[in-house]
Design a protein with these regions (language model features):
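Phosphate- and other anionic-substrate recognition elements at nucleic-acid/protein interfaces
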Residues: 1-218
Length: 218
């Protein structure tokens, strides 16, 4: 018989922030941690445009994806300090655009560090891009990783959030909530019914020791 937990799914929009290319990936993940790709793409902006117009293009693309695919949560990768401070600055602006898009849609927003995403998808927080892309394709049952890398990265971010459930900034515009890696909830009453059911299913899955999808054979 089919596992009833497979009927309980969460749809996550993962965003890999970038001003020239912003990866956007939507995945459905059930309570047994099986993941499937719903959409993947890259929002682009021309270097010939002024900065605020470039950001507007990225914002419009995120709004369109949210409107078309109706994710239940948005997850984005944390921007960390790098040598190129200008690049960090523009990427943080895109991150702000994504936060605003989630806020306009009334969606919870989660932030995950690059090492957290790598660890969730590959089991190694120091994995390189090729390893991440390979595991994204394997987890989602794809023949090959999506291109460019920004697209695959957005899917990895979505998978990371669906599997870990941490990093949430808020379930609603008037509240904050966190879901620990063990599935324990804080501010339970402020979660939506679907989010509460998902967290409980994830916690039960961890207790019963469900097979890690990264180790499943196709």
């Amino acid at each position: 018989t089919d596992d009833p937990r497979r009927s309980l799914k969460m749809r996550v929009l993962g965003i890999d922030p970038g001003i020239t290319r912003c990866g956007l990936g939507v995945v459905d993940v059930d309570a047994t941690r099986r993941a499937s790709m719903v959409f993947v793409g890259v929002a682009r902006s021309s270097t010939e445009l002024a900065q605020h117009f470039r950001l507007a293009k990225i914002a419009d693309a995120i709004d369109r994806v949210i409107g078309l695919y109706h994710p239940e949560v948005v997850a984005i990768e944390q921007v960390l300090a790098q040598d190129n401070l200008r690049s960090v600055s523009t990427t943080m602006q895109v991150m702000g655009v994504a936060l605003a898009a989630a806020g306009r849609a009334g969606l919870p927003m989660a932030i995950h560090t690059p090492s957290e995403v790598k660890s969730a998808v590959t089991g190694n927080g120091n994995a390189d891009k090729a390893q991440v892309q390979h595991m994204v394709a394997r987890i989602l049952g794809l023949d090959k990783p999506p291109k460019p890398a920004d697209a695959a990265d957005s899917l990895a971010i979505a998978i990371c959030h669906a599997w870990r459930g941490t990093g949430l900034l808020g379930a609603r515009s008037d509240s904050t909530v966190a879901v620990s890696s063990s599935g324990k909830l804080s501010a339970r009453g402020q979660l939506t019914a679907a989010q509460e059911m998902w967290a409980q299913a994830q916690a039960a899955q961890r207790r019963t020791g469900a097979v890690d999808p990264r180790r499943r054979r196709s």
